[in-house]
Amino acid sequence: REALLAEGKNPYGHAAFEYSHHIVDLDEKYAELADGENTEDAVSIAGRVMAKRVQGKIIFFELQDATGRIQLFCRINALGEDVFAEMKDLDLGDWIGAHGLMMRTRRGQLSVAVDSLLSKALRPLPEKFHGLNDKETRYRQRYVDLIVNDEVRDTFQKRSKILSAFRRYMEADGYYEVETPILQTVQGG
C-alpha cells in the first residue's frame, strides 16, 4: 500500500469501470475465430488475475470473472514501457480492467489486449502451483478459498441454487421459513 502511495497512485483503484461483456459472452461470440486471427471488435472486460506468465516483451494473464476465464495478451510495443512495467507488478488476485481487440493466438487461445488497471490487490493470492492446502487456513479465510478453488466455489453455487429452489417450492405450497433459534431467549445447541 505504501509503495503505491509513494508512487502517487491510488491503492484502492478507480471508482468505476464500464465493461462491455462477460467472459462467457466472448467465448460464445468468438468461438469460430480461427487460430492467429485478429478482429477489429473492441471489448472491455473486468476480472481477477488468476495466473501470470512473463515472456520477455509479452505478458499473458488469465483473467476470471463470475462467468469464466480468458487470456489477456499484453505487448510492450502496444502498451508502452510505463504501462508494461505496471503490468509486470500485478499479482495474483489483482482486479484489472482490460480494453482491447479480440484475437485468437496462433496456439488457439482466445485473448484480449490490456490497457487499464482497476486496482492492485494489497495482499496477493496464494500461488496457483502451491495453492491453498492448509485446511485451517481454508476454513478461516473462506473468501480466499472461494477465489482460488473452482471446486469449492461450484459447491457453494450448487448449494445456493438447491436451497433457493427448495424455498421457492415450499413458498409456492404456502409454507414460510422460521429460523428456530430466534424463537428462544437463550441460544443453545
Report each predicted region and the residues it spans.
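Class II aminoacyl-tRNA synthetase catalytic cores and aaRS-like
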Residues: R1-G189
